[in-house]
């Protein structure tokens, strides 16, 4: 039992001796992105941002929606921490994996089949049967373009043209 405690204390001491005293944190207050270090922050590449405190220990990288990104160094000597920040705020993105793609293809096929079935049902069959008499038409003679109107004297305006002779 004592050997396991001694071994665990030895492992803990070995790990703690490797800890770097510089701490580089990424803070996200509200909709902003900020870097905080216990020593100075140096920009290697990317979004520069603005110093929040005058001692260069806190840097405001801007809003998350503006996709801040870059590489930053905490410290100035050989024992330094480098942090790469990369934000990607995608408002209109859809993750297209195999399940989503298969679902889109299957729903497209189902919609096409239903549309074809609907067109077949409505346009493929006649709505009713007509009698044979309705298929034949009373045809006029070849010389006649228009069928003459019948004589009627039952309306108010039928007597207006009594003085003029009608061609019969």
UniProtKB/Swiss-Prot annotation:
Annotated transmembrane regions: 103-123
InterPro entries (UniProt xref): CD3_esu/gsu/dsu, Ig-like_dom_sf, Ig-like_fold, Ig_4, Phos_immunorcpt_sig_ITAM
Sorted UniProt keywords: Adaptive immunity, Cell membrane, Disulfide bond, Glycoprotein, Immunity, Membrane, Phosphoprotein, Receptor, Signal, Transmembrane, Transmembrane helix
Disulfide bonds: 37-74
PTM section of the record: Phosphorylated on Tyr residues after T-cell receptor triggering by LCK in association with CD4/CD8.
Domain ITAM, residue spans: 135-163
Modification sites for Phosphotyrosine: 146, 157
SUPFAM superfamilies according to UniProt: Immunoglobulin
Main location: membrane
Single biological process term from Gene Ontology: cell surface receptor signaling pathway
Known partners and oligomeric status: The TCR-CD3 complex is composed of a CD3D/CD3E and a CD3G/CD3E heterodimers that preferentially associate with TCRalpha and TCRbeta, respectively, to form TCRalpha/CD3E/CD3G and TCRbeta/CD3G/CD3E trimers. In turn, the hexamer interacts with CD3Z homodimer to form the TCR-CD3 complex. Alternatively, TCRalpha and TCRbeta can be replaced by TCRgamma and TCRdelta. Interacts with coreceptors CD4 and CD8.
Protein name: T-cell surface glycoprotein CD3 delta chain
């Amino acid at each position: 039992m004592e050997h396991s405690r001694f071994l665990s204390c030895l492992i803990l001491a070995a790990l703690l001796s490797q800890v770097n005293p510089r701490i580089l944190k990424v803070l996200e207050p509200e909709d902003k992105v900020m870097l905080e270090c216990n020593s100075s922050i140096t920009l290697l590449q990317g979004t520069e941002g603005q110093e929040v405190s005058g001692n260069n220990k806190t840097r405001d990288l801007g809003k998350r929606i503006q996709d801040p990104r870059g590489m930053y160094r905490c410290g100035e000597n050989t024992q330094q921490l480098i942090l790469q920040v990369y934000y990607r705020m995608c408002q209109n993105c859809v993750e297209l994996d195999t399940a989503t793609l298969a679902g889109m293809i299957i729903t497209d096929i189902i919609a096409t089949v239903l549309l074809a079935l609907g067109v077949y049902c409505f346009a493929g069959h006649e709505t009713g049967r007509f009698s044979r008499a309705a298929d034949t038409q009373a045809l006029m003679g070849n010389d006649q373009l228009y069928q003459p109107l019948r004589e009627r004297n039952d309306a108010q305006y039928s007597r207006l043209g009594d003085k003029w002779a009608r061609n019969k």
